[in-house]
Swiss-Prot record:
Protein name: Small cysteine-rich outer membrane protein OmcA
Record-linked InterPro entries: Cys-rich_OMP3_Chlamydia
Annotated stretches, region: Disordered: 67-88
Keywords: Cell outer membrane, Cell shape, Disulfide bond, Lipoprotein, Membrane, Palmitate, Signal
GO cellular component: cell outer membrane
Organism: Chlamydia trachomatis serovar L2 (strain ATCC VR-902B / DSM 19102 / 434/Bu)
Gene: omcA
Length: 88
């Protein structure tokens, strides 16, 4: 019982410290096409793991990758500042 409680506490601390900024940005990938919403897709696909980010990993492809070629890409597509910081 103690191990379970300790593991749950550890998971919540680690996930909060590592994912707060991602959660604040609603899992938005600044380089993703405007019509893509990683946040919405991950809300529906919860893996139940020890990770408040639900396993979301930002896209590895550079801005303007091979998907949705006609969509606007880049931080400015989501009105994100050039420095990449989240809007408050």
């Amino acid at each position: 019982m103690k191990k379970t409680a300790l593991l749950a506490a550890l998971c919540s601390v680690v996930s909060l410290s590592s994912c707060c900024r991602i959660v604040d940005c609603c899992f938005e990938d600044p380089c993703a096409p405007i019509q893509c919403s990683p946040c919405e897709s991950k809300k529906k696909d919860v893996d139940g793991g020890c990770n408040s980010c639900n396993g979301y990993v930002p896209a590895c492809k550079p801005c303007g990758g091979d998907t949705h070629q006609d969509a606007e890409h880049g931080p400015q597509a989501r009105e994100i500042p050039v420095d990449g910081k989240c809007r408050q």
